[in-house]
C-alpha cells in the first residue's frame, strides 16, 4: 500500500503593510506612491529577515509557502510588490527596467530600516533584482529560485512577438488593449487579474538585464554572501542550459543533481554547504517545474535558516 502523503499545513494570510516611498524614474522624474508590501513580523526577528522579489507576473504570494515555513522558524519575511502588479499602484511613464525597479526597491528598504542579517530571495524575473540588491546592500545570503539567465529564455521567445503586442497595446483604446492582454495571459496560464497587470508583466520581461547581470555576479563573488540557486528540469519557461550558463559565473557553489525527491540525508549535505567558509549550493531537480517556490519551499526555508545561523 502506498503511503498517503501528509497534508500541507494551512497557509496563514499575509500581513500587508503600506508605506509612502519616493524615488526617481530612469529619466530622473520624481515619483511618490504608496508601496504595498508583506511584513510577517514588523517588530523584527533576532534570527534575521528574508526579503522576497516576485516574478512577472507575481506578488508577495510568490513566496507564501516559503513564508509559512519561515513563520514557524521565527524568521521575518518581507515581500516586495513592484508597481503595476496588482498591489502597489503603477504610475505614468513607468519603465520596467532594473534601474527603475532598483530605485523603488532601495527607497522601500531604506524606509523599512531592517536591522540584523538579511537574505534576499528572488523567483524568476525577480532574481535579477534580488541579485542587484544583494550587491548594493549588506547581504548575508542570496536565494535564486528558477532564475532567468544571460539570454532570452523560451518563455519570452520570439521577442518580436512581445514587441508587436506592446506596440499594438499602445495604439488600441485602453479597454481593448487591456482585454487583449488579459485574454492572452490567461490563455497562456498566467494568474493575472487585469490587462494592466499583464502588460506590465510583459514589459518587465522585455526589460531584463540578461548578460548585464554578469558584473553583479562578479561583484557578489567578492563578498562572503551565502548562496542557493535551485532550478528544475520540467521548467516550461527557462531552459536548464540557460541556468547552467549562469552557474558558471558563480564562484564557490557545490552542485547537486536529483531526479525526484530530495531525502533527508541529501538535504543535510546541502545544508552543510552553508556552514563555515563554504558559500552554498546549486540544486537541480529533474522533475520540478518553474514553481519551486512551492515544491521546494521547505528546502528554501531551511537553507535560509542555516544561512542565518552561519
Predicted regions and their residues:
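Flexible "cap/lid" loop of the alpha/beta hydrolase fold
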Residues: 131, 135, 142-170
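Alpha/beta-hydrolase fold catalytic core
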Residues: 1-50, 72-75, 265-273, 309-310
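Active-site nucleophile elbow and catalytic-triad environment of alpha/beta-hydrolase enzymes
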Residues: 201-219
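Acidic catalytic loop of the alpha/beta-hydrolase fold
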Residues: 234-238, 290-291
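Catalytic active-site module of serine/aspartate enzymes centered on a nucleophile-bearing elbow/loop
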Residues: 254-310
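Short beta-strand/loop motif that positions the catalytic acidic residue
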Residues: 223, 229-231, 235
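Conserved HGGG/HGGXW glycine-rich cap/lid loop of the alpha/beta-hydrolase fold
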Residues: 40-87
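Active-site loop/oxyanion-hole signature of alpha/beta-hydrolase fold enzymes
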Residues: 82-118
Amino acid at each position: 500500500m502506498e503511503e498517503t502523503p501528509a497534508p500541507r499545513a494551512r497557509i496563514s494570510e499575509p500581513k500587508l503593510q503600506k508605506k509612502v516611498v519616493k524615488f526617481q524614474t530612469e529619466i530622473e522624474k520624481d515619483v511618490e506612491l504608496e508601496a504595498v508590501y508583506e511584513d510577517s513580523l514588523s517588530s523584527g526577528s533576532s534570527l534575521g529577515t528574508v526579503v522576497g522579489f516576485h516574478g512577472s507576473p507575481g506578488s508577495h504570494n510568490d513566496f507564501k509557502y516559503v513564508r509559512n515555513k519561515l513563520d514557524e522558524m521565527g524568521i521575518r519575511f518581507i515581500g516586495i510588490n513592484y508597481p503595476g502588479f496588482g498591489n502597489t499602484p503603477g504610475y505614468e511613464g513607468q519603465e520596467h527596467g532594473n534601474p527603475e525597479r532598483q530605485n523603488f526597491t532601495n527607497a522601500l528598504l531604506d524606509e523599512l530600516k531592517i536591522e540584523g542579517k538579511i537574505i534576499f530571495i528572488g523567483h524568476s524575473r525577480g532574481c535579477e533584482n534580488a541579485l542587484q540588491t544583494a550587491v548594493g546592500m549588506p547581504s548575508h545570503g542570496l536565494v535564486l529560485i528558477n532564475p532567468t539567465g544571460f539570454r532570452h529564455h523560451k518563455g519570452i521567445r520570439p521577442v518580436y512577438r512581445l514587441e508587436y503586442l506592446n506596440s499594438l497595446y499602445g495604439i488600441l483604446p485602453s479597454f481593448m488593449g487591456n482585454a487583449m492582454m488579459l485574454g492572452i495571459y490567461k490563455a497562456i496560464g498566467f494568474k493575472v487579474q487585469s490587462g494592466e497587470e499583464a502588460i506590465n508583466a510583459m514589459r518587465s520581461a522585455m526589460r531584463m538585464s540578461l548578460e548585464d547581470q554578469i558584473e553583479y555576479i562578479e561583484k557578489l563573488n567578492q563578498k562572503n554572501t551565502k548562496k542557493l540557486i535551485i532550478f528544475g528540469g520540467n521548467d516550461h519557461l527557462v531552459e536548464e542550459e540557460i541556468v547552467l550558463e549562469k552557474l558558471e559565473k558563480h564562484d564557490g557553489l557545490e552542485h547537486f543533481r536529483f531526479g525526484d525527491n530530495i531525502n533527508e540525508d541529501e538535504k543535510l549535505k546541502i545544508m552543510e554547504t552553508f556552514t563555515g567558509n563554504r558559500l552554498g549550493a546549486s540544486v537541480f531537480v529533474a522533475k520540478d517545474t518553474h514553481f519551486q517556490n512551492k515544491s521546494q519551499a521547505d528546502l528554501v526555508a531551511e537553507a535560509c535558516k542555516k544561512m542565518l545561523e552561519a
